[in-house]
């Protein structure tokens, strides 16, 4: 599975000096390749899905192709995931020659290649020196996170076991954060864990809200395989982004321009928009009162767990008071028209004519989890 979207892929390797055949019993696909294949065949792979790499010290053919049976991508390949094979280092095909094959150490004012033994010895000596001189907590680790195609810190099992399991290092930063903390700490404080929805939600939604994300380009398979069917089922789309991206155009093509609302907010005003929407929706009474009553404090005061886990908001009314922002204030801060904010609120929460609640699926990223707004 590739990246956080989780698209399925099949990986095949076989020796460079071994060939299959066109008959069904002589190839991995089990298909008669001597016959014309249909346009949507899953037995074809693009040049970007092929390479020659080293495996167990030997050259092998490598094919990484989309899994047509995976419910996430249904055989679709994005511009990133469909190039996993091409993005492997290969001395035979010449791909990714800039990838390191040995450690680098900063010596004499420049990065220089060194042996694994030298690199491991250096790390061990520096780490031991810090511990002997002071304390384990004086050791700071800076790293990039995530696994994905090229491997990541979480995949370097030995390193993780050393620093987190054995030494229990407390001080760590990763590629997009000053600490190894949550990207969505505020929503967790409100009882909403991230990644808590199914992709099927997009196909069932009355409204799809996209905040600081450009899914056609950045979550291609999720957009094409799940969001587009939702639009074809009648979903309206709200896009919160200072820019007009290709996603906005694609949504207008699929859902109709009249069913797409692009809120081109001023950069860094995401929370002001959400507070305004919250204030307006709550003021209209478009809330699930039973859910709110069962999920919030009713008169009691929230207590902090510790310094790292501050107290959550108390009652729903307290949240309304703390986050209150009028349409006029929100429009002035975000640069949006009041009418567009009202339209967004209606698309998100206004009950249908029969009184049933609207189903809104919200995907958010830049400006909220990767911003300091």
Model-predicted segments: where are they?
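N-terminal export/assembly segments and adjacent metallocofactor-ligating motifs
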Residues: 1-284
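Acidic/polar loop patches that form or flank catalytic/metal-binding clefts of enzymes
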Residues: 20-22, 171-172, 286-290, 340-342, ...
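Long, well-ordered, tryptophan-enriched scaffold segments
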Residues: 122, 238, 245-355
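Conserved short loop/turn motifs at secondary-structure junctions
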Residues: 140-151, 329-336, 364-372
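A glycine-rich, hydrophobic/aromatic-adjacent loop/helix-cap motif
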Residues: 142, 344, 348-373
């Amino acid at each position: 599975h590739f990246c956080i979207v989780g698209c399925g892929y099949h990986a095949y390797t076989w020796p460079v000096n071994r060939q299959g055949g066109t008959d069904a019993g002589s190839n991995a696909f089990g298909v008669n390749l001597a016959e014309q294949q249909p346009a949507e065949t899953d037995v074809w792979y693009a040049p970007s899905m092929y390479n020659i790499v080293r495996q167990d010290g030997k050259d092998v053919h490598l094919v990484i192709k989309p899994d047509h049976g995976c419910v996430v991508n249904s055989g679709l390949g994005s511009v990133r995931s469909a190039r996993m094979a091409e993005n492997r280092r290969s001395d035979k095909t010449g791909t990714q020659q800039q990838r390191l094959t040995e450690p680098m150490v900063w010596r004499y004012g420049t990065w220089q290649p060194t042996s694994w033994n030298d690199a491991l010895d250096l790390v061990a000596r520096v780490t031991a020196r810090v511990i002997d001189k002071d304390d384990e907590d004086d050791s700071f680790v800076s790293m990039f996170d995530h696994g994905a195609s090229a491997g990541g810190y979480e995949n370097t099992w030995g390193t993780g076991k050393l620093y987190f399991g054995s030494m229990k290092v407390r001080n760590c930063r990763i590629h997009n954060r000053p600490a190894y903390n949550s990207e969505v700490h505020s929503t967790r404080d409100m009882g909403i864990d991230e990644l808590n929805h199914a992709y099927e939600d997009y196909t069932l939604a009355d409204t799809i809200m996209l905040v600081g994300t450009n899914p056609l380009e950045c979550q291609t398979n999720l957009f094409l395989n799940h969001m587009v069917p939702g639009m074809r089922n009648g979903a309206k789309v709200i896009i919160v982004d200072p820019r007009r991206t290709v996603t906005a155009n694609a949504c207008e093509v699929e859902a109709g321009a009249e069913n797409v609302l692009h809120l081109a907010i001023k950069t860094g005003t995401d929370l002001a928009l959400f507070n305004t929407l919250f204030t307006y929706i709550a003021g209209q009474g478009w809330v699930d009162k039973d859910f709110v009553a069962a999920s919030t404090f009713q008169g009691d005061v929230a207590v902090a767990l510790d310094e790292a886990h501050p107290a959550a908001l108390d009652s729903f009314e307290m949240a309304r008071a703390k986050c209150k922002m009028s349409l006029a204030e929100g429009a002035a801060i975000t640069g949006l028209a009041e009418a567009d904010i009202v339209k967004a609120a209606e698309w998100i929460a206004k009950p249908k004519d029969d009184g049933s609640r609207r189903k809104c699926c919200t995907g958010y990223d830049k400006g909220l989890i990767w911003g300091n707004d």
